[in-house]
């Protein structure tokens, strides 16, 4: 039996955004690859449709353990997510000139169905979440 949860975090896998990404509607297929050492929480999400499109992503709970949100019904249905464990949530990291300048987009998490590997970028309530939350490593 394949452990979809472990595979998607430790191996290079292909994920698909059927509707594209906001700002990149032409980019549908991405490779998600662990970035750096195996113990790092970061991954690279590189477009297979446009080599100029790529992002550093991270599981938000590494830096914000209390981060939680309700996925709207339409997104849950579109991705066939019925249980929270059916999904992997990643947030886009913006690197700064200095490591302490890095930020993470908590407003627009990327939600991936662990089994089908279909994904979308959710847009949450801007009064509750920050598009440029500080990314301050804690013991990493």
Model-derived segments and spans:
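Short aromatic/basic micro-patch
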Residues: 70
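Short active-site loop/helix that positions an aromatic residue
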Residues: 73-83
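Long, compositionally biased stretches
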Residues: 1-66, 84-140
């Amino acid at each position: 039996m394949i452990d979809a949860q472990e595979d998607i975090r430790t191996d290079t896998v292909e994920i698909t955004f059927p509707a594209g990404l906001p700002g990149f509607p032409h980019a549908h297929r991405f490779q998600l690859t662990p970035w750096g050492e195996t113990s790092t929480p970061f991954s690279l999400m590189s477009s297979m449709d446009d080599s100029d499109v790529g992002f550093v992503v991270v599981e938000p709970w590494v830096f914000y353990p209390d981060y939680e949100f309700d996925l709207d019904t339409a997104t849950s249905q579109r991705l066939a997510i019925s249980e929270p464990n059916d999904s992997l949530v990643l947030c886009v990291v913006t690197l700064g000139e200095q490591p302490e300048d890095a930020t993470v987009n908590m407003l627009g998490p990327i939600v991936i169905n662990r089994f089908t590997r279909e994904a979308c970028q959710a847009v949450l309530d801007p009064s509750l979440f920050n598009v440029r939350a500080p990314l301050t490593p804690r013991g990493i």
